[in-house]
């Protein structure tokens, strides 16, 4: 299953990142940043009209490379001008060709909330999302047990990040 492959690759990638910058150092940097307790994603999604979270992604396992020339910043700004409520930025590098700089630069250049869309399996990724400027993170029930989901949700909230929780069926919701 593709999800299992992605998670396996993320574990390898995160282990390499931890060799470059330790979890303790990343945590210290993230906790030193201002904690936005306004939770802008929730506020952005309370408009009476339809709310859109528009996605910025270079590639996907099903479609391959979507845009060889990938003007991610232009795309994000156009979404904002078109009335998007928030922007979702793929940061997963192996299957979606995401990069941290996409999230960081978009967050610095738009005024709407920015969601870090990754396959979050380690608290390291949550601290990193905060440092990169995310307003929110994606938590996927299919790859997290209940205890880890709650732990990550609490950590994100402590850092001032909103959580968008993805569930695929009734059992994952329970």
Descriptions of predicted regions:
Residues 55-57, 107, 116, 125, ...:
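Short, cationic motifs built from Arg/Lys/His that form the positively charged side of catalytic pockets
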Residues 66-90, 109, 123-136, 149-154, ...:
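Alpha/beta enzyme core
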Residues 36-53, 97-119, 141, 150-168:
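Alpha-helix-loop-beta-strand connector modules within alpha/beta enzyme cores
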Residues 2-67:
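An N-cap/entry alpha-helix motif that binds or orients negatively charged groups
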Residues 24-33, 60-66, 85-106:
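Glycine-rich, proline-tolerant flexible connector loops at the mouths of alpha/beta enzymes
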Residues 60-64, 93-97, 122, 143-146, ...:
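Short, small-residue-enriched loops and turns at beta-alpha junctions
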